Amino acid sequence: MTDKKRIVRCGLIQCSNPLNDEGRPVAEIQRAMVDKHVAMIEDAGRRGVQILCLQEIFNGPYFCPSQSTRWYEAAEPVPGPTTELVAGICRRYQMACVVPVYEREMSGVLYNTAAVYDADGTYLGKYRKQHIPQVNPGFWEKFFFKPGNGGYPVFRTRYAKVGVYICYDRHFPEGARCLGLNGAEIVFNPSATVAGLSQYLWKIEQPAHAVANGYYMGCINRVGTEAPWNIGKFYGTSYFVNPRGETVAQASEDRDELLVADLDMGMIDEVRGTWQFYRDRRPEAYGEITAQ
């Protein structure tokens, strides 16, 4: 008799900003985005999602084109009121969650962070975005975030071992490998990126990480355009990819959407039993990577 398959139902939420008015208070803009997400989080619970991930700094617009200090007001402790609110909703459905927010460690020390909670609402820890871009046409993130200092943690939820790699991180294979070495079965990549800059890479990099490291990835991008900056269209197309590099499920380019997929954890052993990348890697030969 074979063992019962371990299937994990995962969800991604891609969402447009409902209040595109730079003249409104930061707290009001954030509240509108949170209110919009609450209904979608509830829907995920009703649909039986076991692990849910939201988009990069989900509770507001992608404000990095502004280089305005007013957006420092958007930062909060982690864990904090926003992450605890989401975790409380998810707990009612026994749903683990990844909650990306703008973190304030102390005055002047701010991070791009994702909090991870287990299905019973227990706070498991956080991942801080390691790679901080300064890239046209408006990704001025060094104005807002310090580079992460917490390594590449993997969180043991009730359903699976989860890692997080935020947006620009995905351009760097080194951290993706660290997540695999640390035991990740599913890596979530919450993002905010626009057409014309990275859309072709969106279809390449995460499947490559999934194949090279033998895990699933859940990749999220927001949708719509955000005034007043209008740096381009956030092209959505959130998706899940399996350890073979095959797309399991994909969302639209332009609609608010909850994407749900059932992921077979048995495929991880199957793929790693064929492609022995962990056995055959040569860390002693890679010193040049960190020596310069």
What function would you assign to each model-found segment?
Residues C10, V116-L124, V241-A249:
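Short, glycine-anchored, charge-dense loop/turn motifs used at functional sites
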Residues P18-R31, E141:
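Acidic/histidine-rich helix-loop elements
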Residues V26-K126, T193-A212:
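Cys-nucleophile CN-hydrolase/nitrilase-fold catalytic domain and related Cys-dependent amidase chemistry
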Residues A75-V98, K161, C167-L258:
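CN hydrolase (nitrilase-like) catalytic-core segments centered on the catalytic cysteine
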Residues E84, G88, E105-E185, A195-A208, ...:
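Active-site catalytic loop in hydrolytic enzyme cores
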Residues V99-V101, T113-V116, P153-F155, S238-F240, ...:
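Short beta-strand scaffold segments in enzyme catalytic cores
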Residues T113, K126-R128, N189, Q250, ...:
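Residue-level detector of high-confidence beta-strand sites
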Residues I268-Q292:
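A conserved C-terminal secondary-structure "cap"
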